Amino acid sequence: MDFITKKILILVKTYPSLSKKYTELVCTAGMDEDGNWYRLYPIPFRKLSDEKQYGKYRWIEVKMFKNPEDPRIESYKIVYEDMKLLNKIPSNDWGAKSNIVLKKEVHTDLSKLIELSKSTNISLAVFKPTKIKNFIWKEVEREYPKERIENIEAERKQLNLFSNADENINDFKIVNKLPYKFSFVFEDINGKEATLMIEDWEVGAAFWNWTKHYKSEDIALQKIKEKFFDDYAQKKDLHFFLGTTRQFHNMGKNPFIIIGVFPLPKVVQNSLF
C-alpha cells in the first residue's frame, strides 16, 4: 500500500448517502494544484469533529492511497483522521478558483466523454453545456426503507464501541431523505440533449432551509429553480462537475451525474481569455 500526501481543493460535496459501515457518506472530490481530479473516501462528513469539517473551495492536506478495488482512476482512500484543513479561497475570488478548475480540459461533447470513461476509466470531469434548457424535479419516496435503517442502526451501535476520537457521534441522526430528485436538461456542443440528475449538497440543503423558512415545499422548489436555473444557468457561465457512480461506471449507457456546479460570473470568464 503506497501512501501519498496531497493538497486538494475541495470542489464537490454531494448530499449524504446511507452506508452500512459508516452510517452515511459524502462523496467528496477536488483537484490538486495542477488541476488533477481526486475522489476522496470514505468521509463520514457529518460525524467529523467541527475542526475537521470542510467547505467547498477549502484546501485540505490528506494522506491517501489508490483503492485497488475501484477501477476509476481518480478514486483514493484517505486517512481522514490525519486530514488537515488549510486556507480557503474567498467566495468572490473567481479568478483563483478558475486557475484550478479550468486548468485542464473542459469537456463539451457528452458522447466523447462517455466513450473516454469506458476506455480510460476517468470518472470525474468539468463539463460546459452549450445550452441549458431546464431545471426539473420529480417526487420520490420520502422515507428510507425501514429494513435498511434498522441494519444501519444495528451496525452503528457496534461501531460506536470503537469510534474514533475525530468522529462526532453524540446524538447523531441519519440525514433526512430528500423527497425529490433534481435534474438539469441541457444540450452539448453537438445539440445532443441530456437530462442529468444533480446530487450537490447545496441543492439538498437549500430545499430543507427554504422549506423550513417558507413552510412550503412548493415555494422551496421554486426558489431552488430561481437559483440554479434563473441565476446560475441564465446569468452565469455555468459549468458542471460530472462524476460516475461506482455501480454504473462500466454498466450504464451514460454513467455520469452532476455532482457539483461552477457558476462562473460571465465578466470573469471574459477576462480569462
Ranges and model annotations:
Residues 64-79, 246-250:
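OB-fold single-stranded nucleic acid-binding module
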Residues 26, 58, 74, 236-238:
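Structural beta-strand/beta-sheet cores of well-ordered domains, especially the beta-sheet scaffolds
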Residues 15, 22, 38-41, 54-57, ...:
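Sequence-level detector for tyrosine residue identity
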Residues 2-68:
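N-terminal ordered "arm"
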Residues 50-56, 64-65, 78-79, 84-94:
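Compact, glycine/acidic-enriched structural inserts
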Residues 1-3, 89-273:
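Nucleic-acid-binding small beta-barrel platforms of the OB/S1 family
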